[in-house]
C-alpha cells in the first residue's frame, strides 16, 4: 500500500514537473514574442493562442493539484524553498545549505556529548579514587548514562588502586 502510494506520488511529481516545464517554456516563448512583436494580425493571434495555451495548462495543473485522488496533496514543500524560488534562487542551493547546517549542528552536538562523557568519566574516576565505597553507585550511573557501552564502567576507572 505504502509502496503503491509512493509510486503514485512519483508519477504525479514527474507529470507535474513536465507540465511546469511546458508552462515555463511557453512563457519564455511568449516573452520572445512580446519583445519581437511586429504588430501584425498573425503575430497577435499567435500571442493570444500561446496565452490561451498557458492558461489552459495552468488550469490543468491546478485541477491536478486539487484532485482528491492525487498524491500531491500529501507532498508539502517548505516555505523557505518557495521563498528561494520566488527570490530567483536555485532550490538546490537551499537543500545544500540545509544539509550543511544540519551537518554542522550534528558535529557540534556530537562534540558536546563527547565532552560531557569525558567529564562524567573523569568525575567518576575521581569519586571512586576518593570515595571507594561509592563505586557501585558510580558504576550504576555510568551504566545508565552510557547506552552504547557493554561494560558498566571503563577499565581505567575500575582498575585504579
Curated annotation (Swiss-Prot):
<dbReference type="InterPro" id="IPR019145">
    <property type="entry name" value="Mediator_Med10"/>
</dbReference>
<dbReference type="GO" id="GO:0006357">
    <property type="term" value="P:regulation of transcription by RNA polymerase II"/>
</dbReference>
<comment type="subunit">
    <text>Component of the Mediator complex.</text>
</comment>
<keyword id="KW-0804">Transcription</keyword>
<dbReference type="GO" id="GO:0016592">
    <property type="term" value="C:mediator complex"/>
</dbReference>
<dbReference type="GO" id="GO:0003712">
    <property type="term" value="F:transcription coregulator activity"/>
</dbReference>
<comment type="similarity">
    <text>Belongs to the Mediator complex subunit 10 family.</text>
</comment>
<keyword id="KW-0010">Activator</keyword>
<keyword id="KW-0805">Transcription regulation</keyword>
<keyword id="KW-0539">Nucleus</keyword>
<comment type="function">
    <text>Component of the Mediator complex, a coactivator involved in the regulated transcription of nearly all RNA polymerase II-dependent genes. Mediator functions as a bridge to convey information from gene-specific regulatory proteins to the basal RNA polymerase II transcription machinery. Mediator is recruited to promoters by direct interactions with regulatory proteins and serves as a scaffold for the assembly of a functional preinitiation complex with RNA polymerase II and the general transcription factors.</text>
</comment>
<dbReference type="Pfam" id="PF09748">
    <property type="entry name" value="Med10"/>
</dbReference>
<protein>
    <recommendedName>
        <fullName>Mediator of RNA polymerase II transcription subunit 10</fullName>
    </recommendedName>
</protein>
Amino acid at each position: 500500500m505504502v509502496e503503491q502510494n509512493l509510486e503514485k506520488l512519483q508519477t504525479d511529481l514527474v507529470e507535474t514537473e513536465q507540465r511546469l516545464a511546458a508552462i515555463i517554456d511557453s512563457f519564455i516563448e511568449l516573452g520572445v514574442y512580446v519583445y519581437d512583436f511586429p504588430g501584425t494580425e498573425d503575430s497577435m493571434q499567435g500571442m493570444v493562442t500561446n496565452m490561451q495555451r498557458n492558461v489552459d495548462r495552468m488550469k490543468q495543473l491546478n485541477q491536478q493539484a486539487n484532485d482528491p485522488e492525487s498524491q500531491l496533496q500529501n507532498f508539502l514543500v517548505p516555505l523557505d524553498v518557495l521563498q528561494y524560488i520566488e527570490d530567483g534562487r536555485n532550490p538546490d542551493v537551499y537543500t545544500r545549505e540545509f544539509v550543511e547546517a544540519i551537518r554542522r549542528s550534528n558535529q557540534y552536538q556530537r562534540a558536546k556529548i563527547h565532552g560531557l562523557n569525558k567529564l562524567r568519566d573523569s568525575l567518576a574516576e575521581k569519586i571512586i579514587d576518593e570515595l571507594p565505597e561509592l563505586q557501585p553507585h558510580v558504576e550504576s550511573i555510568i551504566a545508565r548514562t552510557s547506552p552504547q557501552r557493554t561494560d558498566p564502567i571503563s577499565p581505567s576507572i575500575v582498575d585504579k588502586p
